[in-house]
């Protein structure tokens, strides 16, 4: 017996929504058609929603082990499926860092126990993410990591980054970088080095702290041949560097977060609400425009949430002391659909690709496809019903979002992972 998703629509090659039913059996899509034989199968009414491949997020912070007061693998995985994400890659800035086979195994086991989204851990580039000694890349790869990164901090040593890229290239592992030159940072800086920081008399985080590392690493990637991926790109100069790198034939990809696409520093309220504090910071209107242009022309390969939960107590410490980061798994698709697709900035087809097939292709994942024979990772979206973002309804432990109160369409109503229903609100 299988499951038929009926009364739904899928995007065709022209980007048009067309009626389609999908049969799921033994974790795979086994049939697709406008009308399927229901005999012997359970039938789920999708109420006219859009059926897509499950969303993929290449950048989340699940906080476990070590920071379970912020989030756990279970609560993060629940948040993922509630937001339509079926595969998430979790960053290594935990305690201990994900720098050993034992920690990788721990995370994979915890994710399996949770039985929600598929969680794939990153491995740290350097031991304890201190930038001094490379981890056991081969051992981490065999244990099942997604890629290698020291996200949370940038690899400051050019020599260390080159050595990491050389070794990763030999093993066929991607190097994923949080690009931030600490020599250009002023202690306590929390906002972009722009008009808002100046208005409040605060030190700012300059765009060049990001773009200098992007440029450095693209040159190293060209020399070593590694797949190099830039995290949460935020500055127009970084977009230009990635575009130039692609044109030169460098194997470089990058991601952008929803908040950098939808907000700029001038949107930050005068009370400096710390739910608007993230790293990279919200940058200028010009930077935001460059990010959207980068999505349109293919410079930016995917959208990733950079889901970063913190407690309310931590976020109450004021703009200078509160930790960087906001949550994003449960609001990403509705926000992007409402504010980019419905406004005409992106097509629906393009948005879905940026959240499914594009990250799958970049990181060579067998997911993100809506076709017979593909894994039955599926999401159904209600593109018509309006709902208000209410952090009290989040499955995540974190409620740190600047988007509370925003009214959106495009809410997930059903999520399947490997053919198993893990979220249902139909």
From Swiss-Prot:
Report the GO terms under cellular component. cytoplasm
Pathway assignment reads: Pyrimidine metabolism; UMP biosynthesis via de novo pathway; (S)-dihydroorotate from bicarbonate: step 3/3
Residues annotated as binding Zn(2+) 1 are 59, 61, 151, 306
Q: What is its EC number?
A: 3.5.2.3
What residues sit in the active site?
306
Q: What the protein does?
A: Catalyzes the reversible cyclization of carbamoyl aspartate to dihydroorotate.
Question: Which family does the record claim for this protein?
Answer: Belongs to the metallo-dependent hydrolases superfamily. DHOase family. Class I DHOase subfamily.
Q: What is this protein called?
A: Dihydroorotase
Organism name: Brevibacillus brevis (strain 47 / JCM 6285 / NBRC 100599)
**Gene designation:** pyrC
């Amino acid at each position: 017996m299988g499951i038929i998703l009926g009364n739904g629509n899928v995007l065709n090659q022209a980007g048009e929504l067309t009626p389609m039913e999908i049969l799921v059996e033994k974790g795979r899509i086994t049939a697709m058609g406008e009308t399927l034989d229901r005999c012997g199968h359970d039938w789920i009414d999708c109420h006219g929603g859009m059926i897509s491949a499950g969303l993929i997020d290449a950048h989340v912070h699940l906080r476990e082990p070590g920071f379970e007061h912020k989030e756990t693998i279970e609560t993060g995985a629940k948040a993922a499926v509630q937001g339509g994400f079926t595969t998430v890659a979790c960053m290594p800035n935990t305690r201990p860092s994900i720098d050993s086979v034992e920690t990788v195994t721990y995370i994979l086991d915890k994710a399996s126990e949770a039985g929600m989204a598929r969680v794939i851990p990153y491995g740290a580039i350097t031991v304890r993410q201190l930038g001094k000694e490379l981890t056991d890349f081969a051992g981490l790869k065999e244990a099942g990591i997604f890629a290698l990164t020291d996200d949370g901090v940038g690899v400051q040593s050019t020599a260390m980054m080159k050595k990491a890229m050389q070794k990763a290239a030999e093993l066929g592992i991607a190097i994923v970088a949080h690009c931030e030159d600490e020599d250009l940072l002023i202690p306590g800086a929390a906002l972009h080095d722009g008009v808002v920081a100046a208005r409040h008399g605060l030190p700012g985080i300059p765009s060049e702290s990001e773009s200098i590392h992007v440029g450095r690493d693209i040159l190293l990637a060209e020399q070593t041949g590694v797949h190099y991926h830039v995290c949460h790109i935020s500055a127009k100069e970084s977009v230009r560097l990635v575009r130039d790198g692609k044109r030169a034939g460098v194997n470089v990809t990058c991601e952008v977060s929803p908040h950098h696409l939808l907000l700029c520093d001038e949107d930050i309220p005068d009370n400096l609400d710390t739910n608007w504090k993230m790293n990279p910071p919200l940058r200028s209107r010009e930077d935001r425009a460059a990010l959207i242009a980068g999505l349109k022309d293919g410079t930016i390969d995917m959208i990733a949430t950079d889901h970063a939960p913190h407690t309310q107590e931590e976020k109450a410490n004021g703009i200078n002391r509160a930790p960087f980061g906001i949550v994003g798994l449960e609001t990403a698709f509705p926000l992007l659909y409402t504010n980019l697709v419905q406004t005409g900035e992106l097509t629906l087809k393009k948005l879905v690709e940026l959240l499914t097939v594009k990250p799958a292709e970049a990181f060579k994942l067998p997911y993100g496809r809506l076709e017979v024979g593909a894994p039955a990772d599926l999401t159904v979206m209600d593109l018509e019903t309006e709902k208000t973002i209410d952090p009290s309804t989040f499955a995540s432990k974190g409620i740190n979002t600047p988007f509370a109160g925003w009214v959106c369409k495009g809410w997930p109503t059903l999520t399947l992972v490997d053919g198993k229903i893990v979220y249902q609100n139909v």
